[in-house]
Amino acid sequence: MLKEFPHKNLIEIDIFELQPSQFFVNEDKVNAVSSFVNSSKDVVIPIIKKDEMIIVLDGHTRLYAASMKGIKTVFVFDTETEQYIYDFVQEAQRRNIKNVSDLKRLSHEDYEKEWYSYCDNYIKDKKGE
């Protein structure tokens, strides 16, 4: 038996209106998802809205692949998140990451080193507070 999930209202939006909550994309993952990202209908992104921002919670790689293929819009749906995401967005903005075109594409090894290092340090800092 298949599990049923609640229906989500999808909204089509310009990809450059979306604020990333990450800083990097993994080159290997970009190459992998590029094979199935061919139109805006192939990209559905969970988001939250805060003030004037529309924040990407997941799907940064799909979003990046779409932008590389010249896809201008994707579909999004509202969901919920934990408080930490706002810290990640603040750090992204500090790094001048305001939209998908600002994400840094890194090799798999560099991605794991950079992203996991940031996350580990974030967790350590939060535990120390």
Regions found by a protein language model. Give the residues of each.
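Short alpha-helix boundary/capping and kink motifs at helix termini
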Residues: 2-57, 61, 67, 72
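Basic- and aromatic-enriched surface patches that contact anionic nucleotides/nucleic acids
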Residues: 53-129
